[in-house]
Swiss-Prot record:
This is Uncharacterized PPE family protein PPE28. Residues 245-469 form the PE-PPE domain. Gene3D superfamilies: alpha/beta hydrolase, PPE superfamily. It comes from the Bacteria.
Length: 655
């Protein structure tokens, strides 16, 4: 069963932790294992004492020596089994410690209930919004409780999983004891054994061989902590099965929080990635320890998690081999040449909980990275001073980044392989071309004339957008895909090439516009046949009014109105926090980043490179264009989301 605590409110998580049996069963299990270990130690000592007494006493000769040799294996078996039992007791106590830590970190259910009761009381009396500040404070505290419970449960899940990976069944423990091998050597050979035993042994061998399978760990993107069965099926069919035939795909929980994009009060990106990396690494090691190979699927945030885990595993004392582990990543923010985290290396926004991590390692494990052209997360312009290109990428985060699972197998098979890598690499890079610019999608939504107008300007606009990537013919950087490439100032493109592309674009745009206009499909006028009948006596008869029903309706309307006002107020003030955090980042981190870039340019100039002075001025400007455009886009998404929520709340009370 997948853990789903990240999407559960504190009422559920707190109740689960405090209402359970607690640590008593594990303490009892630890005591039982200790008793078993003590009995096994006593049995080993007693058996050893008896056999040694016989040898030292009156039993001498070759038979005595043979007995001592045979008994030694049993004594070793008993002693080693006792040690295993002691280890199991220690692990049970470790599980108790993990649970007690989680219990201490979990909010008590009484505190959660008190918070909800206070909110309900304030909402009931909030007819004119006078309780909005108090409700906001309580809601903020409630969200802190939510985050605290999720963090506690995530820590418990990771700790308990780590303990579970060290546990083995008692039968496995017995089979791993060295003395057991010598005992097995005394069993009859297959020629001497009954045919039924031989068949059973052969079946066991075949089963063990079949157990060496490839397990696919499928993670969701931001806002999808638990991938659905359909999500896992598509990830396998579209991306995984082509490179790893026969993979057994299964969902893997990771928190996937992204404040304030997913939910305004939610886990930050950095916290979510850190927890997800621990969970993924534990799951990989657990599968490899079970004798399975592993292939990992990561999308968006989980591609960042995969990138971190690659480096962590490769640097560990016991790294998996490339034959045991592989990765498939889509919409990767850490794409070496195009990922938004790689375009702005090292930048961090503490108020938003977002830090740009390094590029995905390209020569540690077999990896495939798929990127849709103009995806602003995985295919950010190399030259963001081109405002049109940057704005198109921001639109791409909304219109393109979510399209990876609606592609057809034919589109993925037609992806362009980027083969101009540098040096040895285990990673294959693919670009999936996009027909239309995301920037023009709002225009295309205009009825009748939207598509013709968009097709009129798109060819020339695409030339301008593509210049932000370095080549007017491509909406992605054509430099080596496995080299971490930060943003730059100006592309090295001949003006003649640009002029030729614009001339060709003008001709294409006029031709496309003329074709669209000549094939317009105008809506048909209504014939009136669907108009409702207004004839006398038609329709459902209206029930007679009564005083009781009228009062009941007024009470319901009053309650609905109060609840709606409260919800609208809560949504409105909830947008203030992310707005303040975005402003905080814009007023503190962005200027600091500009100074850092300026000093880098000055340092470059002092070392004799005259371009350093240009970079000292140009790099901060380019960064500002990208970062302030992204901040504006993020704020717009927050406002749109809040507006939709408010509209839905209001429409609920309007008949």
């Amino acid at each position: 069963m997948l853990p789903n605590f990240a999407v559960l409110p504190p009422e559920v998580n707190s109740a689960r932790v405090f209402a359970g049996a607690g640590s008593a069963p594990m303490l009892a299990a630890a005591a039982a294992w200790d008793d078993l270990a003590s009995e096994l130690h006593c049995a080993a000592m007693s058996f050893g004492s008896v056999t040694s007494g016989l040898v030292v006493g009156w039993w001498q000769g070759s038979a005595s020596a043979a007995m001592v040799d045979a008994a030694a294996s049993y004594i070793g078996w008993l002693s080693t089994s006792a040690a295993h039992a002691e280890g199991a007791a220690g692990l049970a106590r470790a599980a108790v410690s993990v649970f007690e830590e989680a219990l201490a970190a979990t909010v008590h259910p009484a505190m959660v209930a008190a918070n909800r009761a206070q909110v309900a009381s304030l909402v009931a009396s909030n007819l004119f919004g006078q309780n909005a500040p108090a409700i906001a404070a309580l809601e903020s505290l409630y969200e802190c409780m939510w985050a605290q419970d999720v963090a506690a449960m995530a820590g418990y899940y990771v700790g308990a999983s780590a303990v579970a990976t060290q546990l083995a069944s008692w039968l496995q423990r017995l089979q791993s004891i060295p003395g057991a091998a010598s005992l097995d050597a005394r069993l009859p050979s297959s020629a001497e054994a009954p045919m039924g035993v031989v068949r059973a042994v052969n079946s066991a061998i075949a089963a063990n061989a079949a157990a060496a399978q490839t397990v696919g760990l499928v993670m969701g993107g931001s806002g999808t902590p638990i991938p659905s069965a359909r999500y896992v099926e598509l990830a396998n069919a579209l991306y995984m099965s082509g490179s790893v035939p026969g993979v057994i795909a299964q969902a893997l929980f990771t928190p996937q929080g992204l404040y304030p994009v997913v939910v305004i009060k939610n886990l930050t990106f950095d916290s979510s990635v850190a927890q997800g990396a621990v969970i993924l690494e534990s799951a990989i090691r657990q599968q490899i320890a079970a004798g399975n190979n592993v292939t990992v699927f990561g999308y968006s945030q989980s591609a960042t998690i995969s990138s971190l885990v690659m480096a962590n595993l490769a640097a560990s004392a016991d790294p998996p081999s490339p034959d045991e582990l592989s990765f498939t990543l889509i919409g990767n923010p850490n794409n070496p040449n195009g990922g938004v985290a790689t375009r702005f290396p090292g930048i961090s926004f503490p108020s938003l909980g977002v830090t740009a991590t390094g590029a995905t390692p390209h020569n540690l494990y077999p990896t495939k990275i798929y990127t849709i052209e103009y995806d602003g997360v995985a295919d950010f312009p190399r030259y963001p001073l081109n405002f049109v290109s940057t704005l198109n990428a921001i639109a791409g985060t909304y219109y393109v980044h979510s399209n990876y699972f609606i592609l057809t197998p034919e589109q993925i098979d037609a992806a362009v392989p980027l083969t101009n890598t540098v040096g040895p690499t285990m990673t294959q890079y693919y670009i999936i071309r996009t027909e239309n610019l995301p920037l023009l999608e709002p225009l295309r939504s205009v009825p009748i004339v939207g598509n013709p107008l968009a097709n009129l300007v798109q060819p020339n606009l695409k030339v301008i957008v593509n210049l932000g990537y370095g080549d007017p013919a491509y909406g992605y950087s054509t430099s080596p895909p496995n080299v971490a490439t930060p943003f730059g100032l100006f592309p090295e493109v001949s003006p003649v090439v640009i002029a030729d592309a614009l001339v060709a674009g003008t001709q294409q745009g006029i031709g496309d516009f003329a074709y669209d206009v000549s094939h317009l499909e105008l809506p048909l006028p209504a014939d009136g046949s669907t108009m409702p009948s207004t004839a006398p006596g038609s329709g459902t008869p209206v029930p007679p009014l009564s005083i009781d029903s009228l009062i009941d309706d007024l009470q319901v309307a009053n309650r609905n109105l109060a609840n709606t006002i409260s919800k609208v107020a809560a949504t409105s003030y909830a947008t203030v926090l992310p707005t303040a955090d975005i402003a905080n980042a814009a007023l503190t981190i962005v200027p600091s980043y500009n100074i850092h870039l300026f000093l880098e340019g000055i340092q470059q100039a002092l070392k004799g490179d005259p371009m350093g002075l240009v970079n000292a001025v140009g790099y901060p400007l380019a960064a500002d264009v990208a970062l302030f455009t992204a901040a504006g886009g993020l704020q717009l998404l927050i406002i749109i989301s809040a507006g939709r929520t408010i509209a839905n709340d209001i429409s609920a009370i309007v008949p």
